[in-house]
Amino acid sequence: MAQVNDVRASIQVCMFDQYGTVVDMQTGLTEAAAPYLAAKGWKGDPNSFVTWWRRTHFENSMIDALLHREHTSYREIGHRSVAFVLERAGIPYTLDEVGDLVAHIERLRPFPEVPEALARLQRRYPLMVLSNVIPTCWKRRSGITEFRSTV
């Protein structure tokens, strides 16, 4: 037990990613995309659509980083990714529709256990988000009102 206590005593801050760690992206975005895709007459699986969206988003984020480009906002990469996936799936869209789908990211809910877990951690450690998070998403949905965000 001494080793565990030594490790706990050495922790100075807890850092984690926002998307997929704090908030349930797959479920939330699938719930948001399903009615849109159905209204467009798309017969595919909304969960697969969201997986393509998220994978494309990740790939675009990595390409920006690897090419040492200026920072591209999470929202902008989201717009590019959704438009690409809609195009790939043969779904006609408008830029407003793309914006509406991406805006759902700001309304994602945390995984059920997250608010209590963060509250417990925050009593003992400073919490940080190491992410290209949209700051309003963190404040609104995480249950934590004071945090430091590092991008």
Predicted regions and their residues:
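N-terminal helical cap/lid subdomain that shapes the substrate entry/recognition surface
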Residues: 4-112, 134
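Substrate-recognition/cap helix-loop segment adjacent to the acidic, metal-dependent catalytic center
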Residues: 40, 91-95, 115-151
